[in-house]
């Protein structure tokens, strides 16, 4: 996947469907995730004459890590991509862990809309139980994250290693309690293979992107 060089020297993986337009959709993948998870969406947008761009967040795949990043830091990366590609207005779409990053884009002056699909809610606010309805694995994961980077890094190595080599045939087992029956019903065949491939690409270099998302 093409690499885009940022001003601070880091590089991001970028997928652009090549439509010649100053308007675009910018896609934000989940946690963990990779730009390739949006491949079908980019193709569908292209068939409709709509420019679409997906990227791998800092620390995922071959996108360089941005140590200490927070959600709002995504705007600096995206702004530089928009500048280079002469995008004057865009809509952002994100799912799961990409939801907050998608919403953060509304602070970028060129943004004209944002859609969060099953996005992660805010942590630490009085009127939301962040972990309500999540699987036991998420409870363990976020509990480790709250104890610091060394603890969550060890948790990843102890519990998430299988995701680095996951295949379509074992993706449901790998997700464990994180998905329900409705998800399992559609996560088969080509959908399962695509999801597994995205996970492998996301974690091919390290767990850094996942750790920083948490």
Model-derived segments and spans:
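Short, well-ordered alpha-helices that flank and scaffold nucleotide-derived cofactor binding pockets
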Residues: 43, 80, 104-108
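Conserved donor sugar-nucleotide recognition element shared by glycan-biosynthetic enzymes
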Residues: 70-75, 99
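Conserved acidic catalytic loop of the alpha/beta-hydrolase fold
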Residues: 73-91
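Conserved hydrolase catalytic core segment
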Residues: 88-130
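Alpha/beta-hydrolase
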Residues: 134-214
């Amino acid at each position: 996947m093409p690499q885009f060089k940022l001003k601070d020297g880091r590089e991001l993986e970028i997928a652009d469907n090549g439509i010649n337009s100053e308007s675009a959709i910018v896609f934000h993948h989940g946690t963990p995730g990779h730009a390739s998870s949006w491949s079908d969406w980019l193709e569908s947008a292209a068939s409709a004459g709509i420019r679409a761009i997906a990227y791998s967040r800092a620390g995922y795949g071959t996108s360089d890590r941005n140590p200490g990043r927070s959600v709002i830091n995504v705007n600096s990366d995206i702004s530089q991509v928009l500048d280079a590609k002469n995008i004057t207005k865009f809509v952002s779409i994100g799912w799961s862990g990409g939801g907050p990053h998608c919403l953060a884009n509304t602070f970028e002056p060129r943004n004209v809309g944002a859609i969060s699909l099953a996005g992660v809610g805010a942590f630490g606010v009085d009127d939301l139980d962040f972990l309500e309805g999540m699987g036991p694995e998420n409870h363990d994961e976020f509990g480790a994250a709250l104890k610091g980077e060394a603890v969550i890094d060890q948790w990843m190595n102890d519990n998430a290693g299988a995701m680095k080599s996951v295949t379509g045939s074992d993706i449901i087992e790998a997700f464990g309690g994180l998905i329900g029956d409705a998800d399992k019903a559609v996560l088969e065949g080509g959908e399962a293979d695509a999801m597994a491939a995205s996970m492998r690409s996301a974690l091919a270099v390290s767990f850094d992107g996942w750790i920083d998302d948490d």
